[in-house]
Amino acid sequence: MNQIRQAPATSASNATESKQEIRNYTMNFGPQHPAAHGVLRLILEMDGETVVRADPHIGLLHRGTEKLAESKPFNQSIGYMDRLDYVSMMCNEHAYVRAIETLIGIQAPERAQYIRTMFDEITRILNHLMWLGSNALDLGAMAVMLYAFREREELMDVYEAISGARMHAAYYRPGGVYRDLPDTMPKYKQSRWHKGKALKRLNAAREGSMLDFLEHFADTFPQRIDEYETLLTDNRIWKQRTVGVGVIEPDVAKAWGMTGVMLRGSGVAWDLRKKQPYAKYDAVDFDIPLGTCGDCYDRYLCRVAEMRESNRIIKQCVQWLKVNPGQVMVENFKVAPPKRESMKDDMEALIHHFKLFSEGYCVPAGETYSAVEAPKGEFGCYLISDGANKPFRVHLRAPGFAHLSSMDAVVRGYMLADVVAMIGTYDLVFGEVDR
């Protein structure tokens, strides 16, 4: 409801003008707005340029993912997880398959655990590069988007090489991963866009295996991050737009259920990879970047520092995987499909494959909650089984939902232009918020 306050007495000669009432006005920010990051509709009550109240409206991307997952066998819903936070695909899969593994009582082989750890961090870098480019673009720094997508394209090639898809990989499976790392990387072919010395430079790191390619990437990525920081970190316009904007105190962040960078940017050292280690995070060395002021600038610095730490983890995983061959799927034929070679000359293997992917498998009755440290925060899957081949209940804990709930409390008192900066540092994706 519009608030009305009497205009202060003035010495204006126009009597009608002095009796005018000053009203707050309502502004619709999104859903068709380039800075809304999807389908966010934010109803802002404005007093001039100052935000008095913010009312986020969600649901425009609701697809009933939880109910869909409850209507299909356990192993047919992995693809739905990719489409929740569609910038952090494999991290979503990780939470879901871990929940299934807990109920069945199986554990992925060590090599598969290292592969999962490595791809979780590749996914984190993919997410943070997308965030960095889009947030900088929202605030007027277009060049950063072009720089960020240069490296992002290399990691998308890794996704495509391992799963056949650039985004929706469906690579993690209960009991391990879909397949081992390939021995070759796809190369660029000569075209109007790639030729001569540029083509040779692009293909130079693709001569060996995927691990060789990732090792080269991990060696060169810190210099690329330095380039991003050259463009932004000490840029006075960037600092004017982010320093002291969107300050979230530690107690406020915890009260709203914030996780991930939104919490660590306020100085709270909470990271599931350290506090509740899963996969092989207890076997790799990395640090947790923390903010001090809890503003947009601190959250920017935390994400940039996280990319450096993710790069460290990838490097350690690559070194381990190079010298430790082994299985990537548990030897439990309840969940593991037969090998492709055996299906070509063994009817039983063919039947096994057909039954596994058409009917799935029954999971022992019970309930569990499995969470991972996704790029945006704690992504969790609460799974209940009644002993059938379909989940009785699937509930997904999306970090963006809790973060968006705090929008009204955080943006009050700031200018309209600051709302764009704050929405950007929230790093919202409505696939997971609306589900």
From Swiss-Prot:
InterPro entries: NADH_Q_OxRdtase_suD, NADH_UbQ_OxRdtase_49kDa_CS, NDH1_su_D/H, NiFe-Hase_large. GO terms for molecular function: NAD binding; NADH:ubiquinone reductase (non-electrogenic) activity; quinone binding. The keyword Cell membrane applies. Its EC number is 7.1.1.-. GO terms for cellular component: plasma membrane. It catalyses: a quinone + NADH + 5 H(+)(in) = a quinol + NAD(+) + 4 H(+)(out). It is a peripheral membrane protein. Keywords: Cell inner membrane, Cell membrane, Membrane, NAD, Quinone, Translocase, Transport, Ubiquinone. It is found in: Cell inner membrane. NDH-1 is composed of 14 different subunits. Subunits NuoB, C, D, E, F, and G constitute the peripheral sector of the complex. HAMAP family: NDH1_NuoD. NDH-1 shuttles electrons from NADH, via FMN and iron-sulfur (Fe-S) centers, to quinones in the respiratory chain. The immediate electron acceptor for the enzyme in this species is believed to be ubiquinone. Couples the redox reaction to proton translocation (for every two electrons transferred, four hydrogen ions are translocated across the cytoplasmic membrane), and thus conserves the redox energy in a proton gradient. Belongs to the complex I 49 kDa subunit family. This is NADH-quinone oxidoreductase subunit D. It comes from Xylella fastidiosa (strain 9a5c). The gene is nuoD.
